[in-house]
Amino acid sequence: MLSRSGLRGARLRVVSLTSQRRLLNHFITHPPEPIPPPPPPAPSSSPSPKQFTLAVKDNIATTIPGLPTTCASGILSKSYVSPIEATIITQLRARGAVITGKTNLDEFGMGSHSIYSHYGPVSQDTPPETSAGGSSGGSAVAVANGEVELALGTDTGGSVRLPAAYTGIIGYKPSYGMISRYGVIPYANSLDTVGFLSKQINPLKELIIGERGLWKEHDSNDPTSLTTAARKRCAAQRRGYRSRQGQTTELEGLKFGIPLEYNIAELDPEIRDAWAAAAKRLQDAGARIVPVSLPTTKHALAAYYVIAPAEASSNLAKYDGVRYGARDAEGASDASAGGVLYASTRGKGFGEEVKRRILLGSYTLSSEAMDNYFIKAQRVRRLVRRDFNRVFALENPLQERETFELSDLPEEVEMEDKWGPEEVDFLLCPTAPTLAPKLKGVMEQQPVDAYMNDVFTVPASLAGLPAISVPMKVATEGAAGLQLIGQYWDDARLLDVADAVAKEVRT
């Protein structure tokens, strides 16, 4: 955390890092001086919060002069200043956040490598010209380079966890509905979640489950923010964050599930070996490792890439040069024919990947495709959620526990307990199927092939579950992530256990 002298040091660091930022391209906007938190509204006997440096993904709205919100898109110019401030920005500034800038991303959060940006791709420093992951690649690089203590990202299908894995840091996606999305430019409303990136888990624990924990705060501006009554019900079913969960740091007695379906053919052998080694280390530390089955996993990625583009096509319809978006002058001068203004503005303002997903989403919502694609994808989503509920020992506090027959499970599933599937505390799997690829290779890759990077992160997003990526050791140079997934609203215990797991698997 920053003192006054630390704030002066942060100012000097901003200046010294300018050339590096140009090289790595991880910031879109960075003011000449860090922006300190606002002064308290009135004299108070309570001490001022400790300050910390914060980078903000540029699809999270800020009203601070000099910090426009661009979403890394040509359709929103750097002159656009949001009329509203995101709730999470207000909350963190009240807790001492010193904002150092807005970070680069895939346009509107659509991508897995932070290459689909109007301002150019994001690159890692070590190794050079390597993908930083996406879509929160800029935030991840800012943390990995030590420029900030904490960075904000958004996680729709893995956009915080994947960059964390590629850059060797912590990436945390809270339970859906815990953190307000108000002021976050939407990609897919039912999936978008504000996420956090850091080198340490303790700052995340302090923010989420500390004395002023964000888990307590309902935001009436966000219809997806869990109500105060629902938060109390969730906490009561978990027997209280601090009394039961917040104290558990030892691994002994915990049961981790290894999803059989995650051992896919596309999994890099080096990642597979690191996954097995991590499981062995946890077992040596007293944890129990058991196989579990999530049979709908094989359909999760396809369902995600139907649901998310469908929601995106609706959300981005307002960027037409009239209500939102920079109007194309050429199209405006020749707007006699119907739709010319819209077509010109959207055609020139949106990047190729965004246009690809808008077209895909518009088709799946059409009358001829709705039943075959969108409705079926929603059914898959319910099955994914059911699979998770079956394997976790804790119940989902927002759903009734479901009973089922053993005949529902595939014949090939092996179970230690023939009375039913193993019930586990957490699931353990890789965050990404490969190490971070070179940017050149990514840019030469077919766009649809890059969607495979989300195969391990998408299921938790579809179910709205908390998940965290921690660095794990691999045989060669490079970074890899180990993902822990918890039951809904089990965030406090997930953060505590992830802290213990990270210490075991980091070296």
Swiss-Prot record:
InterPro entries: Amidase, Amidase_CS, Amidase_dom, AS_sf, GatA. Residues 31-46 have a biased composition (Pro residues). GO terms for cellular component: glutamyl-tRNA(Gln) amidotransferase complex; mitochondrion. It is found in: Mitochondrion. It comes from the Eukaryota. GO terms for biological process: glutaminyl-tRNAGln biosynthesis via transamidation; mitochondrial translation. GO terms for molecular function: ATP binding; glutaminyl-tRNA synthase (glutamine-hydrolyzing) activity. The active site is at residues 57, 135, 159. Allows the formation of correctly charged Gln-tRNA(Gln) through the transamidation of misacylated Glu-tRNA(Gln) in the mitochondria. The reaction takes place in the presence of glutamine and ATP through an activated gamma-phospho-Glu-tRNA(Gln). Belongs to the amidase family. GatA subfamily. Subunit of the heterotrimeric GatCAB amidotransferase (AdT) complex, composed of A, B and C subunits. This is Glutamyl-tRNA(Gln) amidotransferase subunit A, mitochondrial. It comes from Podospora anserina (strain S / ATCC MYA-4624 / DSM 980 / FGSC 10383). The lineage of its organism: Eukaryota, Fungi, Dikarya, Ascomycota, Pezizomycotina.
